[in-house]
Structure formats: structure tokens, C-alpha cells
Amino acid sequence: MTLDTKAAAPERASALAYFFLTCTALCWGANAIFGRLAVGEISPMLLVALRWLVVVMLLAAFAKGAIRRDLPALKARWGYLAAMGALGFATFNGIYYVAAHSTTAVNIGIIQGAMPMFVFFGAFLAYRTPVTALQVMGAALTMAGVALVASAGSLERLAAFEFAPGDVLIVLACAIYAGYTVALRRRPPVAAFSMFAALAGAAFATSLPMVAAEAALGRLQWPTTTGWIIVVLVAIFPSVIAQTCFIKAVALIGPGRAGVFMNLTPVFASAMAISILGEAFEAFHAAALCLVLGGIWLSERGKAGA
């Protein structure tokens, strides 16, 4: 192998990883679009349950070897896996799809883009992770962006704490998912797809009481034809494809560099909301997006200098 070939190998790996990460961010951004399209086509909790049922069936078919090998380790940590699947996969998505009934996909995407800051706060509270001044400034900018979106750019609404219910729910969902992300530090030493399958199974099981509650409240809606299409789409794209691409990208360039690419999620979500759903993109959306992405960039700079 020549020196040029050796030098080109890391570049090819990086290029492939960037492709995988772009696909991941695109799929996660699409989840906001699917959430909005699902309104009137399928009820939120039923969408969550059917989504994870389809994922479990797909993983059982294509990843059964890895699951079988890791089954003893998974059984030993069943309590942890049940809690993680219930929170990170079932509850997060349940709140997410409920929120889609009372806010826009643009708002969902921008607020979800602040997820790294929620993880930052969670890591500090749980593990006392060292914090730099730049990280604090970045967090403040990002939260300002979230507040700007939630108040629709109105200082009066912000001062009166008048926020759309959907925006508040997305903030809550992000906080829950941040807790899930922080708790991943304690994951069992198993293959990524085995872990994913276990969490998906736990999410399906724990979503069933949520569906029962939805039915008891008279809010259960069986999927229309469009609803069934959305179920398949959310199972394949934001779930299986996004997770597969992310796992492959992390293996190629590591979690630190991979995480930065997730900043593309609100950009893709906003672009798709405008082009597919015809949603308006106001000046305050642009300002909020700049604040969120700028805050995350500043925080990453602070981490690098720590």
C-alpha cells in the first residue's frame, strides 16, 4: 500500500461517516414532519406502539444473531433496559407526537435542536461533568433560542410565560431524552443492535398502557390508510435507518465528532416543514435557529478548550 493510499483511507472513512450522519439528521428531522402528518390519521400513543412493534419485528428478522449472543447480558440488566426503553423511546415519542397536535414542525425541529444543551445540563447534574465559561455562554444562547421560538418572538408572551402547549411539551420531551442519553453511560456491554432491539421491545411493552389510557379517554384513533403509511415510515426512517447510520458513523469517527452533525436536524426539519407542509418560516425562527446552533457551536468550542 502506498503512502497516498494510506492517507486516503481516513479521508474515505470520514466522507462515509459524514454521509451516514447526514442521513441520520435527515431522518430525525423527518420525524417532526411525520408527527404533524399523523394528526387526524392516527392517535399519538397508538403511533408509538405500532412504530416500536414494527421495529421489533424488523430487528428480530435481521439482527437475531447478535440478540441471541447478548441475551444473557440483556436479561441481567432487564430493569435498566425496561426503564430506558420506557423513557427514551416510548415516553419521549408519546409526548413528541402529542405536541405535534399543537405546534408546528418548524418549532419542533428548532427546539429539538437544543437537545445537546439538555444533555449538557443532565451530565452536569448526574456526573458533575466539568463546565467551562464558554459552555455556560453556549447554553444560555441555546436556551434563548428555545425561548424565542416558544414565545413566537413576542417579548410580551415571554414575559407572561405564554407558550404554546406543544412547545412546552417538546421541551419536556427533550429533557426526558436528555436523561435517557446521560443514562446510556451505564449501558450493558452488548452489541449496539442488541441494545437497540431490547430498548425497542421495552418501548413497545411500556407503550401498551399508554394506548389503553388513550382508549379510556376516548382519544384512540385507529390508523387510516395514510396513518398506516406513517407508521411504516417512522419505523423505518427515524428508527431503523437513523439508528443504523448513527452506529456506523460513530464506529468510523467516534461519538464526539459524530455528535456535532446532529446540529443539522433542526435545519432539515425546518426545510422539510416549509417545502412539504407549507409552514411559514418567520424572522424569529431564523433568529432562534442561529441562537440554537451558535450556542451549540460555542459550547463545543468550550469543551475542546477544557
Regions found by a protein language model. Give the residues of each.
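Specific alpha-helical transmembrane segments that line the substrate/conduction pathway
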Residues: 46-57, 93-133, 173, 255-275
